Amino acid sequence: LLCHEMIHNWPMMDDSVTGTATWYNEGCAEYYSTMLPLRAGFASTEYEAVQINEKLGERYYDNPLRELSNMELARVQWQDRRGQVVPYGRGMIYLANTDAELKRAGKPSIDTIITSYNWDIQITLENWENFIRENLGEEGIRKFEEMKSGKLIIPDPDAFDGKFEFYEHEVEKDGITMTSYRCRAK
């Protein structure tokens, strides 16, 4: 939790229209609070697998509201607490998948654009879309639009620097059986 909150001092996108950038602000905090300790050698892949499962499981993959759009989530988040946490997991897996796609294509990682901006000089949706279009083309923009619309994001096998193996996991929430995902260290 402390690492998550510390990350909020760095990547920031204007979310004054709640829902437009919650995925980015919370997704970055979740992604980097997982990856930075791992990359620095402060945490093991086994420990971070537990963290990823907690962050992506209950907040996103096991959440009955997971397929609401970002803007729909913003509208319901104060009536249904589950709506508040979807952008954390959705943003995290979107960023992890996007980073994997960029690396496979031999392009700059998400670290490149995210570290180019900070609290004082905030990234905008336009900056993000330009970066995605320039490096991943219209296919990257399509996936970005799908993320915003609430389409379920399937984990990329190379997400999180390729250090984890993802597998399907069935869960039941509110009487509904859903396909979820979990990971384990490779």
PLM regions and their residue ranges:
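Secretory-pathway/luminal and periplasmic proteins that interact with or process carbohydrate-rich
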Residues: 38-42, 60-62, 119-126, 154
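Soluble non-cytosolic domains of exported or imported proteins
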Residues: 1, 19-23, 85-93, 104, ...
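Acidic helix/loop microenvironments that form the catalytic cleft of cell-wall polysaccharide enzymes
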Residues: 26, 30-33, 109-122
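Beta/coil-rich, acidic/histidine-enriched accessory regions frequently appended to metallopeptidases
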Residues: 120-186
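Long, well-structured alpha-helical subdomains associated
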Residues: 43-93, 128
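Short glycine/serine- and small hydrophobic-enriched flexible loop segments
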Residues: 31-38, 93-104
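Structural helix-adjacent loops and short alpha-helical linkers that scaffold large soluble proteins
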Residues: 37-49, 102-110, 135-143
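Zinc-dependent metallopeptidase catalytic helix centered on the HExxH motif
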Residues: 1-61
